[in-house]
Amino acid sequence: MGHYHRLTHIEFRHPAEERINGKSFGMSMQLHLRDMQGRLAAVSVLLVPSGSENPFIQQIWNHIPLVRNEPVAPPDVMLNIADALPKDQAYYTYMGSLTTPPCTEGVTWYVLKNPVAVSAEQIGIFARLYPNNSRPLQASSSRLIKESRGAMPASPSGGQGFAPAPAQ
């Protein structure tokens, strides 16, 4: 039997901290996960500007703190993470670290190959509030980057799926 990863939190980065084949992206959404053994994983969803607003992102933006680093209570809305992911969930994966101090190592990263469209205005709103909040591009340090042949497993660990984080 597989195991679950719990979504612990979502972070946004402007610009995206990842590059694919040298191409950079304006923004990314990082889904941070932890399994029952305490192992960390993160799914990076690259965001690209388009003409239309992304409803999932807009639900989050409706509750975004207007002052940097100001804590905000989670919105009283249900978010379906599947709505934030591209239809084709092919990915790259590697062992890396968290991108904020203390930059803990041992994080399994999944970078989705296919970006998700958001409006230029949605990127602009975040960029004005949180300009350049991403970690500089890091050297690969001989990390092995693997490419999927299909969609992400139901759980990044190959287990049964995601579950919401327990109430605190």
Where are these regions (language model features)?
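Extracellular or lumenal secretory-pathway regions
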Residues: 1-26, 30-168
